[in-house]
Amino acid sequence: MVSQRRVVVVGAGPRGLSAVERLTARAAQTRARVHIDLVDPFPPGAGHVWRTDQSLLFLMNTPSLFPTVIAPDGALGVDPLAEVRNMSFERWRRGVVDGSITPVSALDQAERDALEALTSQDFPPRAIYGRYLEWIYTTLNNHLPSNVTLTVHRAEAVDAWVQEEARHRYAVELAGGQSIPADAVVLALGHLDAHLRPGQKELVDGAAEHGLTYWPPTVPADAPWADLPEQETVLVRGMGLNFCDALAQLTEGRGGTFEPDKNNPERLIYRPSGKEPHIVAGSRRGTPYRAKPQLKGYYAHTLETRFFTLEAVQNLLDTSSEQLSFERDLWPLIRKDANWNYYRVLARTSPDAFIEPAGDFLRKLDAILLDNDGARWSQRVEALVSASVVPGRQLQQERLARPFEDVNFDSHDEYAAAVVHYLDRDVHGSLRGEDDPVKMAISSLNAARTVLKCVLAEAGISDSSWVNELRRDFEPFVEGLASGPPVLRIQQLAALTRAGVVRFLGPEPRFVVDRNEGCFVAASPWVSDTPVRARWLIEAMSPANDVHRNISPLLSNMHERGLVRGKLMETRDGASPVTSTGLDVSASARRVDTALGGLKLGTGAFAYRVVGQKDAVEPGIFVLGLQLSSVQWGVSIAAEADSPAHLGARTLADADQVAQAILAE
């Protein structure tokens, strides 16, 4: 009889759950005997970020129709077990509402109300998504094939090593001292705590010296929001998604209410409870992420993707021996699509924005975009737009992400008025959906991210381009535009600002400790007003996803043993390599399929194995998820329901490749 293979999966959140699901499905087909040890101090399925006991005010950043941990039939070669087949979050949600699916434990009334209020386009509470993940895990566990067994260890993995002479090649140690033997180890670690940056350490030290309160970056569900005082100034650094979570807890979470504005259907009115702190927020761009447009699906149905396609990138690969560059090869194609979709919608909805007939303009624009004349196309578009489009209606992509860059304000009140006007316009655009040119340009960027993830994973770009162009420049730009919250959050922020609950510092603020006055001080160089002083400062951001800064006994000990290392990237000739944020792994980012004569996009998913200190590939230690940020981009984005494996479901395809590799040993 073939011996049983033992697999330790470290991390029981979505990526670890995918590993379990794929191992189970593959083992059911091959009849291989497998024992899975699932290790995580948090509950299996939901894990840390999606745990089911968190506030229902914390929302996902994707609508109900988007996320899944189960690939559609036919996507991965071997379908999931029958009990979970095709079970995306949206299908699970509908099943719970109509009574055909029973949650693992009974929903309380608040959960039931939240679930029944959702539509496929609404953004669900994270705790409700955790309920889905919990159900998937429990259903898998209850219907394991006879050749598969599973043990859950509610503990932290703290070490792993190679056992040269033992029956099983590896051992994984848990907090408390238990050691688990393994033939293979899957690192699906998810979000980890991280060491603070030097400036943050200075704030910690200053707070300790003067009795101030400083909250470092954390997962929002872990923060003790009730500790923040009523009616005192609280500085908040960061205006991304965690900022929305902070606002929800400090307003609705304290009894405040939002109601429709009877005089303006696009606005809300906030009724304070009196228990709110005085929130003063700041970030580099000075504004929150732009709201997502209201669409009938995740992508705009009328969006035209003409230039940045897998076929176009394939042509680049087939006609050049050079490694791709983001700035030279990919970004121009992405910009072309954004320009085309912006002006196409502008011509349809606002023909008076053109000095010449809108149809004539589009024909000229089309000709320029189709002409492969290198970098000159951009200057030609700029000249055409300058001559043909009314000022104020021209697309300025960089200004979209930083609307107040290099703009001076005389007071906080003046800046707040400008921000509220900006928020109202953003809400108006989101509610127009596919009739808004700006939102369609942003939707084009959002669609490009899916194609870009495939290109980067399968073809790759140069190290210098990865570090300096993709991660440093493009990533913050596109996140501020395409990774924004639901429009409800921007409506709420505008209402809170009108109610005087929230104020803004301005772009590029500095946060320091004034040791003479014994308080935090924050000010923006672009707003000429008295600096804001406070005894409370919170970082509205999650810990950095960076293996060199992450606090993980497991990774630290594996690094000391030489089993893992961070990936180094060569950014320019003769310069010292820089450390990237992810682990070094063995799967090449440039896949060569010799049967087809070269790299063929859309055909590759990978079983990523760790690379150790001496360039040695460890054959039985695999990586899934966030720690792959050196070879994949957008690693925190969930798998997309009903998407092809090489596009929106790549995380599931990678888990499938890992399962195949493990069972083939």
Describe every region a protein language model picked out:
Residues 1-54, 116-664:
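Flavin (primarily FAD) cofactor-binding/catalytic cores of flavoenzymes
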Residues 42-111, 618:
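Redox-cofactor-proximal catalytic regions of oxidoreductases
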